[in-house]
Amino acid sequence: MKAYLSNPAKASLLLVILIGTVTLVHAGSVYHSTDAINKTAVTNKATASRAAAEAKRAEMRMVVATATSIYADMDLEDSGLSRQAFQNAWIGYYKLKKKGLLKKTNVLTICDFSQSSSNQRMYVIDVRNRRVLYRTYVAHGINSGEEYANSFSNKMESCKSSLGFYITSRTYSGVNGYSLRIDGVDKGFNDNARKRAIVIHGANYVSMRVVHKYGTMGTTFGCPAIPTEMTTQIIPVVKNGSCFFIYYPSKKYLAQSSVLNS
């Protein structure tokens, strides 16, 4: 060491070696420090993701519990409305409301197509006061089935009903009289509703009289038609931004609905 210190050139070389060693040690420390930070960030992100997923599951458990309570309190089973129809309707209604997509949140309409068309299978529910405002007949598309609807489509000219969630829009007077436009918001299942001219309208072939005479309810080109005399009662209540749901226990729909699974 003394030899190095007495020789300026060797002293400089020693200094360079020492600085390089310190630099390498420091660089290694920085590397290990950065690696630790990255691992911590990944861990924190995973923890946050799990927490968010659990919070969402807890939220859905609460929504389902609320639906179960309302279903029981309103004795909806006695009215023929299936538990699954109401539960899914409530979940979708909740999600659409949470996203701010519903202008009118005090009304929820459910068409339970798991029932026979000769049943009064359309329910207009007062959400706030938890009571059924109207229960009436509703027709399905001619190519969806006869007494029971069991085939559904979003395709043009299919003449089939489309499953899923809709948001009601404006009224108009057309060939079927006082009618209501609806917008399908379930991607791939009913989002062609406007193009297909799917609306709520009255029809004289939707009545018990028709069932008694012909043995089955009349059908449509895909519209959820109701008795003509009910249009002036129901349409003003549900128009302009309320949730309208057409249900059937389709495994594909329930698994892929963009509303239910959002």
Positions of predicted regions on the chain:
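Short aromatic/basic micro-patch
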Residues: 225
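Cell wall/extracellular polymer interaction/catalysis modules
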Residues: 35-220, 228-236, 242, 251-253, ...
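Active-site proximal loops enriched in glycine and acidic residues that flank catalytic Cys/His/Asp
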Residues: 248
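Bacterial Sec-dependent N-terminal signal peptides
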Residues: 1-37
